[in-house]
Design a protein with these regions (language model features):
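Nucleotide-sugar donor-binding catalytic core of glycosyltransferases
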Residues: 2-268, 272, 276-294, 339-340
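Alpha-helical elements of Rossmann-like donor-binding domains used by nucleotide-donor carbohydrate transfer enzymes
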Residues: 21, 25, 211, 308-312, ...
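Conserved aromatic
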Residues: 93, 300-303, 336
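Residues within well-ordered alpha-helical secondary structure of globular protein domains
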Residues: 250, 312-315, 335
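A short acidic/histidine/glycine-rich donor-binding loop in glycosyltransferase catalytic cores
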Residues: 293-301
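C-terminal "capping" alpha-helix adjacent to the active site of nucleotide-linked donor transferases
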Residues: 301-321
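A charged, aromatic-enriched C-terminal amphipathic alpha-helix characteristic of glycosyltransferases
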Residues: 317-341
Length: 341
């Protein structure tokens, strides 16, 4: 049984992809475990619509009372504001789980000097582990590396005794809405798709798109490379998230690079629509992890590798691609990486 009462403390300003992932996962779990009860502050601007708000949202005062009685509180990082004060006022750190979706931003996560500064504790800006939350919260889930204190890490005393408080890898996952247009028996009619909102950070986005376009033109593949935009705050292209989900559902091979961190929602949108994926080196888990060991994932370290993988996957589309053959692995991916996993 999963008869827990869970309060989700959302960011104070704007929405957050990571928080959306948590809310979607809880709503999916509730379908399987009706005894599960979760609530969040109704002012949070999630993308799930009015019915979701009516079912799970609470006015601020009511949410405070719910949180007092909750078994678990999930405190979500917010780029523009994290509500640490809410937990402090309740004096509820002993039942608070911190989910850290922070990222360094732009393409700075590629910089080895900055990586070293994070390990040494010199860098304390956006994207660095929150040492205070490590000490206060029984569990700390984190979207981006590092997941441990490193060679300079402090030890913290907990109810379990003296031990090094590590962080649990918790990347974004496959949300239920990503698969809204996917139909298992429907034939896909787009060979390659490379859709990005902006192409400056990292520039790999621009170059992989251009290489994909040239490759498809040369080899007669159907290609989609229109830019996407995110509503309601940022507009950079003609395709909204809703439209992009429809495109992924029609796509055989998706192109992915890192975003403002190693992780990106695009990676999970592509996998969620039963596509093959050519992805920049996946660095979400520890080096010996097999969490993403799937045949459909073709990785590249540089543009030379990317071109090689384009040729390899293109040949597979010509001679060996059968959509039905992907279904068994697709179900395993959903089992391990959907938001309810």
């Amino acid at each position: 049984m999963m008869d827990y009462r869970i309060g989700v403390i959302t960011p104070t300003e704007r929405d957050d992809f990571y928080c959306d992932t948590v809310l979607d996962g809880l709503s999916e779990l509730k379908k399987e475990h009706p005894g599960l009860e979760f609530r969040y502050p109704e002012y949070y601007p999630h993308p799930f619509g009015g019915d979701f708000k009516a079912r799970y949202g609470l006015a601020k005062d009511t949410f405070v009372e719910f949180a007092r009685q909750a078994d678990v509180l999930i405190l979500s990082y917010g780029k523009y504001g994290t509500d640490f004060e809410f937990v402090e006022n309740l004096n509820a750190w002993d039942k608070t789980v911190y989910v850290d979706g922070s990222e360094i931003g732009k393409d700075k996560w590629r910089d080895p000097t900055l990586q070293y500064q994070i390990i040494s504790g010199e860098y304390k800006g956006r994207g660095a582990p929150n040492k205070e939350m490590q000490k206060k919260c029984p569990l700390y889930f984190r979207r981006e590396k590092p997941y441990a204190n490193g060679i300079y890490g402090e030890r913290s005393r907990t109810t379990c005794g003296e031990r090094s408080r590590t962080m649990i890898p918790f990347p974004l996952g496959i949300e239920s809405r990503f698969m809204r247009y996917y139909e298992p028996g429907k034939k896909k009619d787009i060979d390659f798709s490379a859709m990005f909102g902006q192409e400056l950070y990292p520039l790999t986005r621009r170059y992989t798109r251009e290489l994909t376009e040239a490759f498809c033109k040369k080899n007669g593949f159907v290609c989609h490379t229109e830019k996407t935009y995110r509503l309601p705050l940022i507009k950079r292209g003609p395709y909204s998230p809703e439209k992009s989900y429809e495109i992924w559902a029609r796509t055989k091979v998706g192109i992915c690079t890192g975003a403002a961190g190693y992780d990106s929602r695009r990676f999970w949108e592509i996998l969620g629509n039963n596509c093959l994926i050519i992805a920049e080196r996946i660095d979400l888990y520890e080096p010996d992890s097999d969490a993403l060991n799937f045949k459909r994932i073709f990785q590249y370290n540089n543009l030379y590798d990317f071109e090689y993988q384009l040729e390899k996957v293109g040949e597979f589309l010509r001679s060996g691609y059968n959509q039905e053959d992907l279904e068994e692995e697709y179900q395993e991916i959903l089992k391990r990486h959907s938001t309810r996993a």
